[in-house]
């Protein structure tokens, strides 16, 4: 099992390119099921999750070709299998995103209940409720969501909570439904907007994406399109937290700063010097960061996917920070590992109190989920001595060659196999 060996204490300097957003790429790949015509997607990140999605689509009969420049061409003109099996779905919760497209275009689907990071229940009941409102007959059989419909019919749907994947699934189902669908309490995330922009290029009629009320007028069919996946705001924020903790001066190319308002505000509050352009961000930290608290919230609030990285920055900051996790339960599993490095953190329910320390010291730590992995890498970059991060397959689910990019910024970080760490 691969690990990362990090020798901390070196500031980060230079520039790297931000990859396409995982959380946009996954639903966009699944949208290929909505048409028999080719879909050409640029800026698709090379991640375990995108590879799993492509394997899942391939199992269904979707033909996919990946070019060296990050372009993926998909064509779903020979789909002959409408099932997403547990063996693929168990590793990635986003596999549920094939449910809406399959149901809308083919009238049936059989999708295993999902897995993914162990950071809370994240139930799919809102997906099921919404699809049922569109006229689908849905049952849970032997661990599978089994759905059938002759043709979906437009409806007004209000989800009980803001759900990103739920909004995306219902959006993809609604574009081929008969009549108008109104999604109330819809997710406003940039990744939802990116999916909607692709669907519009494919011939969908969508209004209101980026707000909490999306209106979809269904069409009979969609056609092929060309689309570039939006930049990953979480990857960009992770690298900025890294320079905040380790010090230095970095520039991120291919970024989307207009999607990162809440994160950039927190980093400025922490003492980073931030400069932005249309597609770049420069972040510099000279001296010790200031402790900064945060409450996670749906977009445009502070993202839950940035909570662990900000906490890693706070572990070496001057002062005390209070972080409140409002989105998911069980998302403080990185805390005990940060404490192994010398962090001073107390947890009380959804609240974490982080007292900054003058220095962290390297140790062996274990990643527990995707963003927790990133927080341990950040802490390792700031720590004195050597840190070994185990179970980095979590990291590979959502970061495109993180150690390669960090080395380009001057970090001492190497991927090693289990044998090499003995």
UniProtKB/Swiss-Prot annotation:
Catalytic reaction(s) noted: phosphoenolpyruvate + UDP-N-acetyl-alpha-D-glucosamine = UDP-N-acetyl-3-O-(1-carboxyvinyl)-alpha-D-glucosamine + phosphate
A cellular component term, taken from the record's GO annotations: cytoplasm
Chain positions recorded as UDP-N-acetyl-alpha-D-glucosamine binding sites: 93, 122-126, 305, 327
Matching InterPro entries: Enolpyruvate_Tfrase_dom, Enolpyruvate_Tfrase_sf, MurA_subfamily, RNA3'P_cycl/enolpyr_Trfase_a/b, UDP_GlcNAc_COvinyl_MurA
Domain of life: Bacteria
GO BP terms, alphabetized: cell division; cell wall organization; peptidoglycan biosynthetic process; regulation of cell shape; UDP-N-acetylgalactosamine biosynthetic process
Catalytic center residues: 117 (proton donor)
E.C. code: 2.5.1.7
Binding site for phosphoenolpyruvate: 22-23
A molecular-function term among this protein's GO annotations: UDP-N-acetylglucosamine 1-carboxyvinyltransferase activity
Pathway: Cell wall biogenesis; peptidoglycan biosynthesis
Keywords: Cell cycle, Cell division, Cell shape, Cell wall biogenesis/degradation, Cytoplasm, Peptidoglycan synthesis, Pyruvate, Transferase
Modified residues (2-(S-cysteinyl)pyruvic acid O-phosphothioketal): 117
Enzyme type, top EC level: transferase
Cellular localization per UniProt: Cytoplasm
Record function comment: Cell wall formation. Adds enolpyruvyl to UDP-N-acetylglucosamine.
PANTHER family (alphabetical): UDP-N-ACETYLGLUCOSAMINE 1-CARBOXYVINYLTRANSFERASE
Family statement drawn from the similarity comment of this UniProt entry: Belongs to the EPSP synthase family. MurA subfamily.
UniProt-recorded name of the protein: UDP-N-acetylglucosamine 1-carboxyvinyltransferase
Gene: murA
């Amino acid at each position: 099992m691969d690990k990362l060996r990090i020798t901390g204490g070196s500031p980060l300097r230079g520039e790297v390119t931000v990859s396409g957003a995982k959380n946009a790429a996954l639903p966009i790949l699944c949208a290929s099921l909505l048409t028999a015509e080719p879909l050409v997607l640029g800026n698709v990140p090379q991640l375990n999750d995108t590879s799993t999605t492509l394997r899942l689509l391939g199992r269904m009969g979707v033909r996919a070709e990946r070019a060296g420049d990050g372009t993926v061409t998909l064509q779903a003109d020979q789909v002959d299998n409408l099932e997403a099996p547990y063996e693929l779905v168990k590793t990635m919760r986003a596999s549920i995103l094939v449910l809406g497209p399959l149901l809308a275009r083919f009238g049936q689907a059989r999708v295993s209940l999902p897995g993914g990071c162990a950071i809370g229940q994240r139930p799919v009941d809102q997906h099921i409720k919404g699809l049922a409102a569109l006229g689908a007959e849905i049952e849970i059989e032997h661990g599978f969501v089994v759905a059938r419909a002759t043709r979906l019919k437009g409806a007004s749907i209000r989800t009980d909570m803001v759900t990103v994947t739920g909004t995306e699934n219902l959006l993809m189902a609604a574009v081929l439904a008969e009549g108008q669908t109104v999604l109330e309490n819809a997710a406003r995330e940039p990744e939802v907007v990116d999916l909607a922009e692709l669907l519009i290029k494919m011939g969908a009629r969508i209004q209101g994406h980026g707000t909490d009320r999306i209106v979809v007028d269904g069409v009979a069919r969609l056609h092929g399109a060309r689309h570039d996946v939006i930049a990953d705001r979480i990857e960009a924020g992770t690298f900025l937290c890294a320079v905040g903790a380790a010090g230095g001066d970095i520039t991120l190319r291919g970024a989307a700063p207009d999607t990162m308002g809440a994160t950039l505000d927190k980093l400025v509050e922490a003492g980073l010097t931030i400069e932005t352009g249309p597609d770049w961000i420069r972040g510099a930290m000279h001296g010790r960061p200031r402790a900064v608290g945060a409450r996670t919230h749906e977009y445009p609030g502070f993202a839950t996917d940035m909570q662990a990285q900000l906490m890693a920055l706070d572990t070496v900051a001057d002062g005390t920070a209070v972080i409140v996790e409002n989105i998911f339960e069980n998302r403080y599993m990185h805390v005990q590992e940060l404490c192994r490095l010398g962090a001073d953190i107390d947890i009380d329910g959804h609240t974490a109190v982080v007292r900054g320390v003058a220095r962290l010291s390297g140790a062996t730590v274990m990643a527990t989920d995707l963003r927790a992995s990133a927080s341990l890498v950040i802490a390792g970059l700031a720590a004195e001595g050597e840190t070994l991060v185990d179970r980095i397959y979590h990291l590979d689910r959502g970061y495109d060659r993180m150690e390669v990019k960090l080395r380009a910024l001057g970090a001492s970080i190497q991927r090693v196999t289990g044998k090499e760490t003995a």
